[in-house]
Design a protein with these regions (language model features):
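Aromatic "clamp/platform" in nucleotide-sugar-dependent glycosyltransferases that forms part
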Residues: 78
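Conserved acidic donor-binding segment of nucleotide-sugar-dependent glycosyltransferases
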Residues: 110-111, 115-122, 131-136
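Nucleotide-activated donor-binding/catalytic signature segment of Leloir-type glycosyltransferases, i.e.
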Residues: 31-58
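Glycosyltransferase donor-sugar binding loop
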Residues: 16-37
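A short hydrophobic beta-strand element within the catalytic core of glycosyltransferases
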Residues: 73-74
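Short hydrophobic beta-strand element within catalytic cores of glycosyltransferases
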Residues: 95-98, 108
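Short alpha-helical donor nucleotide-sugar binding micro-motif in glycosyltransferases
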Residues: 57, 65-70
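A short, well-ordered alpha-helix in the C-terminal region of glycosyltransferases
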Residues: 124, 131, 138-153, 159-165
């Protein structure tokens, strides 16, 4: 995502990425683990510190507010199964871009409810982000379709009934 952000910034110099995590730059260098050092180096080398906002831990209401203020939600995972964050963003009607991993295609149809890109392709991710920014009406259309789809796949009562049916069949 940071590699894609460096590309997006060339076209949208005011772009901001909000990350629900502690600020890597505020961690003393000797206290950083390998991943934190890697992220800090990427931020520094790409001159992205002014474009990334680390929100720290957020409660449910703060998360909802952050989602709703976002022009696009990006799930850049390299490993996922059924990502809750993608479902949350879709339920809130936020335009979504997700890496093509795990169960993402079960939650979202590429081009209809959001955009799906190869997890190892920051250039395509950057392109997709720029497309969402450049075509807000298309992004809003996908977000509406995503919200409708997520409303079906994340219906707690319906999912409980399906689970009950499965266990009833197993118990027979």
């Amino acid at each position: 995502l940071l590699q894609a952000l460096a590309i997006v910034r060339k076209r949208y110099p005011d772009v901001k990425l909000y990350v629900g995590r502690k600020d890597y730059g505020r961690i003393p260098p000797l206290a950083r683990n390998a991943y934190e050092r890697y992220i800090h180096r990427l931020l520094r080398e790409s001159d992205l510190y002014d474009h990334v906002v680390f929100t720290g831990s957020l409660n449910a209401q703060q998360m909802k507010e952050r989602y709703l203020k976002s022009q696009v939600f990006v799930l850049p995972s390299s490993i996922e199964n059924s990502p809750n964050s993608l479902g949350e963003a879709m339920l809130l009607g936020v335009p979504c871009i997700a890496s093509d991993v795990g169960g993402v295609r079960c939650l979202m149809t590429h081009g209809a409810e959001g955009l799906i890109y190869p997890a190892d392709d920051p250039h395509l991710l950057a392109y997709d982000i720029c497309e969402m920014f450049a075509h807000p009406e298309k992004a809003a259309q996908m977000a509406r379709a995503g919200r409708e789809h997520a409303g079906k796949t994340h219906d707690a009562q319906k999912n409980l009934e399906i689970l009950h049916q499965i266990y009833t069949e197993i118990a027979r």
